[in-house]
Amino acid sequence: MAFQLALDALAPTTHRDPSLHPILESTVDSIRSSIQTYPWSIPKELLPLLNSYGIPTSGLGTSHHPHAAHKTIETFLLCTHWSFQATTPSSVMFMKPSKFNKLAQVNSNFRELKNYRLHPNDSTRYPFTSPDLPVFPTIFMHDALMYYHPSQIMDLFLRKPNLERLYASLVVPPEAHLSDQSFYPKLYTYTTTRHTLHYVPEGHEAGSYNQPSDAHSWLRINSIRLGNHHLSVTILESWGPVHSLLIQRGTPPPDPSLQAPPTLMASDLFRSYQEPRLDVVSFRIPDAIELPQATFLQQPLRDRLVPRAVYNALFTYTRAVRTLRTSDPAAFVRMHSSKPDHDWVTSNAWDNLQTFALLNVPLRPNVVYHVLQSPIASLSLYLRQHWRRLTATAVPILSFLTLLQRFLPLPIPLAEVKSITAFRRELYRKKEPHHPLDVFHLQHRIRNYHSAISAVRPASPPHQKLPHALQKAALLLLRPISPLLTATPFFRSEQKSMLPNAELSWTLKRFALPWQASLVLLALSESSILLHKLFSPPTLQAQHDTYHRHLHPGSYSLQWERTPLSIPRTTAFLPFTPTTSTAPPDRSEASLPPAFASTFVPRPPPAASSPGAQPPTTTAAPPTPIEPTQRAHQNSDLALESSTSTEPPPPPIRSPDMTPSAPVLFPEINSPRRFPPQLPATPDLEPAHTPPPLSIPHQDPTDSVDPLMGSHLLHHSLPAPPTHPLPSSQLLPAPLTNDPTAIGPVLPFEELHPRRYPENTATFLTRLRSLPSNHLPQPTLNCLLSAVSDQTKVSEEHLWESLQTILPDSQLSNEETNTLGLSTEHLTALAHLYNFQATVYSDRGPILFGPSDTIKRIDITHTTGPPSHFSPGKRLLGSQPSAKGHPSDPLIRAMKSFKVSGNYLPFSEAHNHPTSISHAKNLISNMKNGFDGVLSLLDVSTGQRTGPTPKERIIQIDHYLDTNPGKTTPVVHFAGFAGCGKTYPIQQLLKTKLFKDFRVSCPTTELRTEWKTAMELHGSQSWRFNTWESSILKSSRILVIDEIYKMPRGYLDLSILADPALELVIILGDPLQGEYHSQSKDSSNHRLPSETLRLLPYIDMYCWWSYRIPQCIARLFQIHSFNAWQGVIGSVSTPHDQSPVLTNSHASSLTFNSLGYRSCTISSSQGLTFCDPAIIVLDNYTKWLSSANGLVALTRSRSGVQFMGPSSYVGGTNGSSAMFSDAFNNSLIIMDRYFPSLFPQLKLITSPLTTRGPKLNGATPSASPTHRSPNFHLPPHIPLSYDRDFVTVNSTLPDQGPETRLDTHFLPPSRLPLHFDLPPAITPPPVSTSVDPPQAKASPVYPGEFFDSLAAFFLPAHDPSTREILHKDQSSNQFPWFDRPFSLSCQPSSLISAKHAPNHDPTLLPASINKRLRFRPSDSPHQITADDVVLGLQLFHSLCRAYSRQPNSTVPFNPELFAECISLNEYAQLSSKTQSTIVANASRSDPDWRHTTVKIFAKAQHKVNDGSIFGSWKACQTLALMHDYVILVLGPVKKYQRIFDNADRPPNIYSHCGKTPNQLRDWCQEHLTHSTPKIANDYTAFDQSQHGESVVLEALKMKRLNIPSHLIQLHVHLKTNVSTQFGPLTCMRLTGEPGTYDDNTDYNLAVIYSQYDVGSCPIMVSGDDSLIDHPLPTRHDWPSVLKRLHLRFKLELTSHPLFCGYYVGPAGCIRNPLALFCKLMIAVDDDALDDRRLSYLTEFTTGHLLGESLWHLLPETHVQYQSACFDFFCRRCPRHEKMLLDDSTPALSLLERITSSPRWLTKNAMYLLPAKLRLAITSLSQTQSFPESIEVSHAESELLHYVQ
């Protein structure tokens, strides 16, 4: 610590580097050794973890490895840990020879290597297999122990009697017994499936491997015992998932301390030494706590582990806020859940944490702290708190005393009559002498009493006599009260009465209650205590203990006790019998290479019968080592295992006497396991359609995501998916054929139940019912049953039970009935059962269902929806709708009857399409001009011409459309999900004779090629397959348009109108996959309405299945796929040679094509099918992809998709693709969310059509039909005053007075945790206001100037368009004039200067970027150079010189003052904007928004000053929208600095921050002199010219005040890493960052003091503006500073200096009258004078009240404008406003009238008003938001004086 302080002191000097030289020199050797030993590039987030394991890696390696951290751990294990253990000649098992050679060079005791090929992959790792076992007494087993059972290790020790020690490395997550969630997901992930644990190192799927799920049991045993053989198991070291175990022969001797003689002392401090100790092991995990279980619920432990820091912060937060809403804990959790350090926490754990915090908010500890109390009050409090416990303890004791007389019968003295005396005179008994009670006298009386007792009861048992010890004890007890006993009646004489009197004598009698009564009393007392415990709350102590145990749980530690393991038998260590060998002689002296055994032992021949065909047996086969060499640290390729591979060897023959029992910790010993393990077979699939299995199972992408996308799947490891046959619904067994409730063949319903049915209504396939009703639950979507029940008066339950007597269960409960409801097939069955005929009124007209030979009729109405619905009764229509299509057309009839593989074509009717001439004309016009298509651009000037050119043909069609009337043509639309088989049935249809006159139009040449290949027509018929342009020039009877939505809008109309011979159009396409977009900016095709909406009514049904996509993609979309291939969703670093590459842009596609890859854009791939996995390229345009393009990319391949590029584009953040993120993270893709306006309108069918009947579905429950609201996806509006979600409202302490903090209940939940919401820590003293006596001033004399006359000729005649610019062929709009009102001049007065209006000028911000922003060359952080450090130090020294500070001195940090600054900053943030504005900007506190990212937008303003008047186009001022975290954390730092700057600032330096115009006037009058000229300066691009030196300067300023280091580091990090939507920025100043004005002012002041010897010269600074009273000499070191600065000065020597819009001088200050004159003109023409007049008047009064001296401040050219402004206010202002021009103080009532409408009141005008009026104005809702609060500025100026 002292050395660090010394280094900090030497930091500004040149002595720091020599002081650090010894330290750097001492680290060179260790760094060099680390780089040589661990040369791999380790991810930076894993480097601290490896260092905490004790691995000395520097992280400076450059070699890349797919799992570098595991490789580092393995190297440390081998070269350091094992090398230290190998003290004798040793053998090594399961290691590559090359790795063993390196290990042997490190330690020569590694003599022998034994490898065994036990898996096909071993042949690639081990060139030879060893026929024998190791020979040395020490063996090192490398990463194979997890595959061996303890019985096999015991077998190894038994086979090798000389084996003493076995060092084994074990790779298994210690938390595997909790769940599948890793504690270090960046280091490893794993999943457990049945009895297999799949381990993935660092997201590298290719390096993953499988092992038994109980391998972690090796960490739970400490010994292995078999009979008299014992092996001890010791865990030497653990590095996360890698453990080093030592298994050695024998057991350690007992601890001698356990055999020590027991001690007799109760207070033995070493008693635990004589007790056996537990063998407890623990493993390192993140710092976590375990949440309590929910009441009466069982929650997994892994879902209750949360970070301790987050829990403690959330616990404090929920009790610190004044108002807590139900959403606040969830928002607080969200802030922390996205942090990389908490990636190990499960989503359920986060949910449980926020729920636990929310529900336990009301709990508080029931404690009191009473210190200054009397003993009686303390006793009373104790009894009130613990009376239950005292009562519970005392009642049983008191009840037990009732039994004491029964079991210990003590005699009780009772009165007995001795004699009676009557009628005698009064006699007195002899008075005994009165003696003082002393000990001896009392002892005598007690002895006499004891003698009397003995005399009365001589037969008393001996134990009832009072012993002598008891007498002594009684005397000692009575000694203190002996004076009191002398006055008792026991010692007084009694007077006998004259009345008859009985003389009594006392005798001892035995008295005892019955034992039954005693037991009853005891039972009643115990029962009362029990009832009290049952119905009363816990005691205070119990409440206290439960509260702290429940809300303050201890840290969770991953530990358990290790126990011995007993095994009944051994299992063979190897699957073959090894040969015997002897140990070679010790050759440690010679450097001989290790020996390898080169004999390969073949496997035993397979059994005669297949193992799978044998029936299961009760005796399990002994285990064999499972993949013992498939280790975590080896990058093995994915091997394709063919179906002809060698069968695994049979297990070794076991002796019959072996029992099948096995250890509990390793249950795999009892389960038969084939060797080696393969993927699970799928016997229900046909072999022809079953893809060959991979050597690794499919991995969930959430467990294999590499943050840097370094993980990849090698292409050649993926087998080509099977070539699918023709689409058929019989690929998978139909549920109807396997239905156990049915019998017989599958036949149409009308054949099984013959009656007269309407045509095509009873042709659906079914089977006879064989079993009675199974009482299936009634479906939720039962509107059909309700409609039939209402008409037939049969209950819905009876109707449902009747259906279960005629239809199989598979047709009653399936996916269709669950999602679409019951259909007309069920209606037909009901009509047959109940003998009625139903007329269903649908969109197609009335349709009859049910037998025609019945007289009972019912009416049902069917609405299409969605959702569709059956309702009882007939729908009343004005006219009967006519049926669509042309049933008499032979083409359409043929299509309706055509079948492919037993399935009908998925359409209902042909729709008459009326062509639109306007659509066709739009498209042909764009084609003619070359905006859409390329035919008109083809060069046909060369070659033989046989007809018109393509362009001439297009022109002819264009002319033809001018005179051709529109026509109606039948259109059939086939729509469905990607790969549903839309194309194949149409191709089979076109092969028929009736449809031979056809042509096909395709959007791309790739799709046209697929059509040619599939149709297999003669070469002369190839003209029938065309691209969309050439198809228009040809003619046919039938037109097939494939991917209609990829055609230009209006293409269907143009195709119909261009071909008079066309009779039928068949269109194919998926409206969800997007539509055509022209690449020409001049095309007008986009102005036509979308084709998806025009063609939507033609979609009769949408095929919701796929033959293409693999199962992993189908699960995402929740769709059924007939492709049995599992597929893959992964990531690659480089594309594979055969895989197609899908890009976002044509440029990227051309690049990949030029590199030799097969590539196309995502949009152009629509309609294509790939066999290899599609590689999706992720780049900057990924986040802009539409949902349609995302759907296309994910559904192109039969094998899956692989992403290539940065993982941030699939990370689920704002800058990523939502659909790709869902796919990559294995989240369901909800189609309603991605296609909210289109998908709900599609009529889905889930299986191919097997019948052409009019089948209708009802998908609404029996209630009335519901329809989705068009805005169902929009959240409801919540008013700001909403308080029903308040969980708790904490009141302030009563002695704090009224609440001065602003409300925070309206803040977004993500922002509220950023507020400290601290009450004012310091009460400011009362401020006394002093009123300066008014001084008599001469009123100024104005020369006559008429405002209107001067304004009429002020604006020169010019063309506003000449002052605009062109940006990307678009004109700017800074001088709008069209339709703008004007009255003063010949043009609108707004043309005086440029007006910045981002809403009306789209070029404003893009055209200003190059001037206002400075970008870094890359995303890397800005590097602070040596010149930046030097210049920053020079500026800091100059700034200290300006404030008369010592650069090396520091100021102690004041926490109380900083807390007050926090309150001020939050007050300013809450009061500067309205509540609605803060709520609307909730995204500013989004936790997913990186703090270094700012959003740049243009500032809307009409700036009028000398530089902008009559100027041309001007770049806008850019504002930076930063995260609320930055504003709320760094804002107090700047306010804290401002307080000290205000206190230290010399009087000759004026800073305009927080100053009023009156203060500016007073300072000028006091300090400015009459010397001329004065130096005024402004900078060009001041903000952009600040580089790294500004960061150094700001950091040094904060260090001087001892600002906490983490805040300084945060500031430096933000400045060097800032990025925007336009790119990364340099360290430039951003308007909007905390302290922009203060830092600019300090930078400007530091530059001035670096340039001049200022001394006591008055200086004025405000941001980049400055003014020096008179010329100053230049400093000698100024040239060295100037060469490092990037500033561009605009120095001006003037006699009339202008500062912040005011002309200043010794007389005071006056507002620039020229700018004010222009503003008044603009306000008049804009008709906004009433809103702005008061503000302009208050600005004018600042100079007007100076009197005659104001003319000394103005240049002569501005006198007329000052006079014109005075004339304007005198003519246009009402009388009460003109009172401000008077020097006297106006009355408060007058000011209140003046400020009755302060909407456009400026900041300066606000400063001039009294505080009462300012508060009243700021409370108005229409008041303009000010950049800073005046009250806050006033508090800052007064704060330091009473804090210090």
UniProtKB/Swiss-Prot annotation:
Top-rank taxon: Viruses
An example Gene Ontology molecular-function term: RNA-directed RNA polymerase activity
All residue ranges annotated as the OTU domain in the record: 728-879
Motif segment (GPP flap): 865-867
Biased composition (Low complexity): 609-621
Positions of the UniProt region annotated as Disordered: 571-729, 859-887
Domain (Peptidase C21) ranges: 730-884
Cystine crosslinks: none
Keywords: ATP-binding, Host-virus interaction, Hydrolase, Methyltransferase, Modulation of host ubiquitin pathway by viral deubiquitinase, Modulation of host ubiquitin pathway by virus, Multifunctional enzyme, Nucleotide-binding, Nucleotidyltransferase, Protease, RNA-directed RNA polymerase, Thiol protease, Transferase, Viral RNA replication
Entry's Gene Ontology BP terms: DNA-templated transcription; methylation; mRNA modification; proteolysis; RNA processing; symbiont-mediated perturbation of host ubiquitin-like protein modification; viral RNA genome replication
Protein family (similarity comment): Belongs to the Tymoviridae non-structural replication polyprotein family.
Protein name: Non-structural replication polyprotein
Native species: Turnip yellow mosaic virus (isolate TYMC)
